[in-house]
A protein has these predicted regions:
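Secretory targeting and sorting signals
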Residues: 1-29
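N-terminal module-boundary/linker segments of secreted carbohydrate-active enzymes
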Residues: 20, 25-69
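Exposed alpha-helical structural elements
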Residues: 38-44, 74-78, 183
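A general structural signal for short secondary-structure junctions and capping/turn motifs
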Residues: 47, 68-70, 91, 141-145
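N-terminal carbohydrate-binding/catalytic regions of secreted carbohydrate-active enzymes
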Residues: 55-96
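Domain-level detector of nuclease and nuclease-like folds
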Residues: 99-190
Length: 190
């Protein structure tokens, strides 16, 4: 995803990179993004060009929530990774636990109120070049647990974000701007 479009992202990222958080969160989080300096290097390496269209886009073209381990799919794996005291049933569905939505600073105790957000939305990836990827590569992108592409957040914050990029949406929790920008750059650099 290294050569994909970054539409109006540079100003937002430059501002976000100026706010480096010095504390470690007291909740689970996806894999740590690269450092601020590495993120800046990645950002400088990205190609900026006109964004494509959503013609032909469908979420179904990004097979997601595949089985990761046993009978746990990607969604369930992220719920366990990002939650605390998560208990699952025999089908790997979360029956209890707590999830902190960093986007809007909300604690959730019912997994049905938790969405798994794609940091770089699938439709945005499509407009940035994923329309030319193989189905296998789109599946890997939609289920990526190696980078901070997937994060458990409140359903309301995820729906507010929708398919928007950082020029149109940032987390309501302004303390999250820097981490969000670094996550976005890391996924885009891939």
């Amino acid at each position: 995803m290294r050569r994909l479009v970054i539409r109006s992202l540079l100003p937002a990222v430059a501002i976000a990179l100026a706010f480096v958080l010095g504390t470690t969160p007291a909740y689970a989080y996806p894999p740590d993004p690269p450092s601020v300096s590495t993120s800046q290097t990645y950002l400088n390496a990205l190609t900026v060009r006109a964004e494509g269209s959503t013609d032909g886009y469908s979420r179904d073209l990004f097979p997601h929530w595949h089985i990761v381990s046993g009978n746990c799919d990607t969604r369930e794996t992220v719920l366990k990774r990002d939650g605390t005291n998560v208990v699952t049933d025999s089908a790997c569905h979360a029956t209890s636990g707590r999830w902190y939505s960093v986007y809007d600073s909300v604690w959730l105790t019912d997994s049905s109120g938790v969405d798994i957000d794609h940091i770089v939305p699938l439709a945005e990836a499509w407009k940035s070049g994923a329309d030319k990827w193989t189905t296998s590569r789109r599946e890997q992108f939609a289920n990526d647990l190696d980078r901070a592409q997937l994060i458990a957040v409140s359903a309301s914050s995820n729906r507010s974000k929708g398919d928007k990029d950082p020029s149109l949406w940032k987390p309501p929790n302004t303390n999250e701007y820097c981490m969000y920008a670094r996550d976005w750059i890391w996924v885009k650099y891939y």
